């Protein structure tokens, strides 16, 4: 996007941007993260770092930055994960807009704040979404672009499916520019779930009819860090996903929204979660089909999971996703879950992983 004096008004500079960074053991990357913000051409910002009990030199590095930049402050967190840390940051934020950055990632474009605000202000968007790239061992790799769903109607199932699942860009809080007033008005905050709290956060924004705008430029570099919570095996992952499903259902009821309109969010959430957890079990337990079967059975016998797979397997229920490959995969997998063919599905998942087909389910899941 080319910036000109015509599409960028100087009075936009009065708008403050709050950058919230949860931090835990990030000494290797935090300088690059902070410098990518400090070097922004748009200078009306503050950085709030929530220190979550780091055992390395991360806090010492931040103290040096605090001495030099009064806009940077470090706050002690609870150590309970990124969700509570971001909530603390939201309470302290003074900005008109909110940007979330992970302590091991960075912003590749020094103009990105100007670009975000030049779209958010004239359009009144509650969330501006940019594209992003992935960093794997110092190698930049492209990610699926949001153009695949950005042109869909925001109220459509196609937008929800691509945005939150098959493409997934809407699931992450990074590469986003949030209007602070919208979050406060809708009382949106992060769950204390141990994982995927950002997916729930953004789904809550969507259910509250957030107005989206899209920026074609790359606004974020996502780094694969094996020490981060995103890449750690979690024995309670299945319980966590069902907790998210229950919280999502409760949020729909709280906001008095039409349940059936948003039910597909819960259905696809459980479908993708079951496959993801089965894959993690397979890799954790050294290619154990028994471990995969056990996980699939957890999903298939849970009351919510059981209902979801019955509904997705029902050919009378139309899937408005306009992607034949995905429809076949969802129908077939769900029918197998409905019939309790867990070991057969486990073999199928093994084949997908062996052929690396599973990587197509997530940009952040590609194995280099």
Protein language model features and the residues they cover:
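Membrane-interface aromatic/basic loop that binds lipid-linked glycans or pyrophosphate carriers
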Residues: 2, 283-368
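Cell-envelope/extracellular polymer assembly enzymes that use nucleotide-activated donors
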Residues: 15-18, 36, 46, 200
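Short, well-formed alpha-helical segments that are part of the catalytic scaffolds
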Residues: 25-39
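Acidic helix N-cap motif at the loop->helix transition within catalytic regions
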Residues: 28-31, 56-65
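A conserved acidic beta->alpha catalytic loop
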Residues: 43, 51-60
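Glycine-rich, basic loop-to-helix element that forms the pyrophosphate-binding segment
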Residues: 74-93, 103
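Donor-binding/catalytic cores of nucleotide-activated saccharide
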Residues: 82, 103-214, 220-236
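Short aromatic/hydrophobic "clamp" motif used to bind/position activated sugar donors
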Residues: 98
């Amino acid at each position: 996007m080319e910036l000109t004096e015509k599409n960028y008004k100087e009075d936009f500079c009065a708008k403050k941007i709050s950058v919230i960074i949860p931090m835990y053991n990030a000494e290797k990357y935090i300088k690059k993260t902070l410098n990518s913000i400090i070097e922004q051409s748009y200078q009306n910002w503050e950085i709030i770092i929530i220190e979550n009990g780091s055992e390395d030199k991360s806090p010492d590095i931040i103290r040096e930055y605090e001495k030099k930049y009064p806009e940077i402050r470090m706050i002690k967190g609870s150590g309970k994960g990124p969700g509570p840390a971001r909530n603390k940051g939201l309470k302290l934020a003074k900005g008109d807009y909110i940007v979330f950055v992970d302590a091991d990632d960075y912003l590749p474009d020094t103009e990105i704040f100007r670009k975000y605000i030049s779209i958010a202000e004239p359009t009144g968007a509650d969330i501006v979404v940019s594209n992003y790239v992935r960093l794997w061992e110092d190698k930049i790799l492209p990610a699926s672009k949001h153009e695949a769903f950005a042109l869909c109607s925001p109220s459509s199932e196609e937008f929800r499916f691509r945005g939150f699942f098959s493409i997934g860009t809407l699931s992450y809080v990074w590469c986003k520019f949030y209007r602070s007033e919208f979050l406060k008005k809708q009382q949106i905050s992060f769950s204390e779930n141990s994982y995927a709290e950002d997916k729930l956060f953004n789904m809550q924004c969507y259910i509250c009819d957030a107005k989206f705008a899209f920026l074609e430029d790359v606004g974020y570099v996502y780094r694969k860090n094996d020490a981060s919570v995103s890449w750690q095996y979690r024995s309670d992952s299945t319980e966590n996903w069902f907790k998210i499903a229950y919280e999502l259902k409760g949020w729909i009821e709280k906001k008095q929204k039409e349940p059936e309109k948003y039910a597909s969010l819960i259905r696809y959430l459980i479908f993708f979660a079951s496959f993801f957890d089965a894959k993690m079990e397979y890799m954790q337990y050294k290619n154990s089909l028994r471990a995969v079967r056990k996980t699939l059975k957890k999903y298939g016998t849970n009351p919510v999971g059981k209902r979801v797979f019955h509904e997705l397997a029902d050919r009378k229920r139309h899937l408005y996703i306009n992607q034949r490959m995905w429809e076949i995969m969802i129908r077939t997998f769900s029918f197998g879950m409905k019939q309790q063919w867990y070991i057969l599905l486990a073999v199928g998942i093994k084949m997908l992983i062996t052929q690396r087909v599973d990587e197509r389910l997530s940009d952040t899941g590609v194995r280099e």
